[in-house]
């Protein structure tokens, strides 16, 4: 099945609704993906890219239903990765002499995957053209390291379509092909996820390359990507977003992620978040347990954030393995213009937080002071965590924050008001976790200042996951 893109250009790619892992298992494609291949029928017939190798046979069969394979004059390979050029072996078995236009680096990659050095390769570089008849040409633009050394884009004159390779794409599967036809929230979420997890390391290359392409002074009516939608409605909107994302991007957002063995580090994360919110309620704070969260969502939030707090328990004197792996991935992504702080709990010796701080600094983050707690944090330790959050909120503020002021009411009056307004603290009889009405439980949408009587009946203890019926009034407050 083909889809008309524009005039004599048809999409002949493959949708992949089921794929959930990309680049091994490093990228979770939660909304599937597509492998976009395009067939151009002018005086010359041109195929731009193929599909993932697992769809090779199906792709060639479908292509044969669109055109006699022998009538394909040229094959353009913008990128040699297997999700772009994976069907070449199956296709070239049918038309072995058809010329393949690609960069010099692509020949090495294609031969490395397919092992056919005898194929009819034609090397192109930036500014080279290929006449396809009817007054139209293909213009080639090398885009090395966006995101492989072999990458290039292809521009078609007359129709003003830019075949952009991986740039401006997204792992997003939909029966509809064009950007104006799909759910806009989903689309732009996947665009940002794609950029944050794949193209961030090459941000410094993106702006010069876009500037170079714009320097050709060629109109762009459509951007036909290798994955996801074709941008036909205001295609420059995604270009403008890329230029924004390349500029050491950050929002007024803080990401907290952690791993924990006994919930001690989780308690610290909650308290730090409370402190941040207390001082700067306008900053967005997102908390993730790495063992229970989508790694790529965490990394996308780091990309969006002005700073990140990373927590780990100590295990054999080092950080938890999932934290170590995620920090290593952040090192490779080379985030810029971001601050960081390490925190965590330990038992007898510690070591993980210091190691984590060093790794975050090596990853290019501007470091703030770290925070450690021994064993399970008590009320005093949790207050230190909240104070750490308050300090972080002030240090990382994008604009000066108003000084917090407290009313100087007598201590007896404050105590009386608190008791009268909020009621007693409650303690879980199973794990001893304490609910403080003054603090609430933000992770369950229980706001600070919520008395126990107003806590929803479906409330669960954050540590042992049991319900309200196992809670008793804290012994020190029982009358």
From Swiss-Prot:
Listed pathway(s): Nitrogen metabolism; nitric oxide reduction
Rubredoxin-like domain boundaries: 423-474
Domain Flavodoxin-like: 254-393
Co-factor note (free text): Binds 3 Fe cations per monomer. Binds 1 FMN per monomer.
Keyword NAD in annotation: no
Positions of Fe cation 2 binding: 83, 166, 227
Assembly notes: Homotetramer.
Family: In the N-terminal section; belongs to the zinc metallo-hydrolase group 3 family.
Name the UniProt record assigns to this protein: Anaerobic nitric oxide reductase flavorubredoxin
